A protein has these predicted regions:
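Catalytic Walker B motif of ABC-type/P-loop ATPase nucleotide-binding domains
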Residues: 183-187
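Conserved ABC ATPase signature
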Residues: 158-162
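Helix-to-loop junction immediately C-terminal to a conserved catalytic motif
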Residues: 76
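ABC transporter nucleotide-binding domain
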Residues: 201-287
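Short, charged/small-residue-rich alpha-helical element at the C-terminal edge
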Residues: 257-329
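Conserved ABC transporter NBD signature motif
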Residues: 84-95, 100-101
Length: 329
């Protein structure tokens, strides 16, 4: 692995493994199969070790079933590992869960911690009581977050009346009221428009830099990672496949982009680069990083009068699929 964090360790995992037993119906056996079940052992995580320094903002990526949720549940103390260890600021999450959860914040794109039919200000007051936050500290922090997240005009609105972007900002406020040392974010920008994404990323960047909040971000959005994460960890089949900079990951595995071109009128397909594919009114051309970009552009321009052109990068899933192929997983 390339990187294990340069700051003093805040999160430490060593050989973290989680095995589960799955019960299955036998294919044969007559009436006995009604009460007899075959069992099969599977591994959600296998020998995962890493260090994360206090104040780091780390991206955790991988396809569905890679082990991301299991890892987060172990670090929050929801699950206990089969073997291996994990400490967060010296605490073992599942053994000291009551103390541990007071230092955590979490925002999950598809789940809510605020109350649906209650004005968000009332939800924040309830969270103050749950976390036993001192009144003065609570008011100072709420004022800070209200200004930073632009919540002033919606404080008396129930969550159900808010747009997706407003709900996400409110959820972030709720998760940060008690000033957690560690924040888990799961797809925080999913479904948001471009402006909302930019504002949310900027808030997280400032929160991380000014308060040294350690943030673990799971996302499929490459722009989230580019904007926020200097370090990424890639999970696959329960294993830690990569731990290093996003720049090096892209340099190694992001070997091709797609050029999309639309023309005013019909294009002369015979002049387009070999392998160009027509998709409706758009032509799609694969750009290899080691290819002759200048020649490709000459061919594209010679094929007709261009109306619009854009370059699409590989998304996270495509990047990981390439990694899997190279590792023969």
């Amino acid at each position: 692995m390339e990187q294990q964090g340069t700051n003093p360790p805040f999160i430490v995992t060593d050989g973290l493994t989680k095995t589960y037993i799955r019960r299955e119906k036998p294919e044969h056996g007559g009436i006995t199969r009604l009460w007899r079940r075959e069992t099969r052992e599977g591994q959600a995580l296998r020998d995962v070790s890493f260090r994360i320094g206090r104040g780091e903002l780390v991206g955790l990526i991988g396809p569905n079933g890679a082990g991301k949720s299991t890892l987060v549940k172990l670090m929050t103390g929801i699950l206990t590992p089969t073997s291996g260890s994990c400490t967060v600021d010296g605490r073992t999450p599942w053994a000291e869960r009551k103390a541990h959860v007071r230092s955590l914040g979490a925002v999950f794109g598809q789940r809510m911690q605020l109350w649906w039919d209650v004005p968000i200000r009332d939800s924040f007051d309830l969270l103050r009581d749950i976390y036993s936050i001192d009144e003065g500290r609570y008011r100072r922090r709420l004022d800070e977050l209200t200004a930073a997240l632009d919540l002033g005009d919606i404080m008396q609105s129930p969550l159900r009346q808010l747009s997706l972007g407003q709900r996400m900002r409110a959820e972030l406020c709720g998760s940060l009221l008690h000033e957690p040392e560690l924040l888990f974010l799961d797809e925080p920008t999913i479904g948001l428009d471009a402006v909302s994404k930019l504002k949310l990323r900027e808030f997280l960047r400032v929160e991380n830099e000014t308060r040294r909040t350690t943030i673990l971000l799971t996302t499929h959005d490459m722009e989230d990672m580019r904007a926020l994460c200097s370090r990424v960890m890639v999970l696959g089949h329960g294993q830690l496949l990569y731990d290093g900079t996003l720049t090096n990951l892209l340099h190694r595995y992001d070997t091709a982009h797609t050029l999309t071109v639309t023309y005013d009128g019909a294009a002369d397909a015979s002049k387009l680069p070999q392998g160009a594919v027509k998709d409706g009114d758009t032509w799609r051309i694969t750009l290899q990083k080691d290819g002759d970009l200048s020649r490709t552009m000459q061919q594209v321009m010679a094929a007709g009068k261009m109306h619009e052109m854009a370059i699409e990068e590989q998304n996270v899933d495509e990047l990981i699929a390439r990694m899997y192929r190279e590792m023969a997983l």
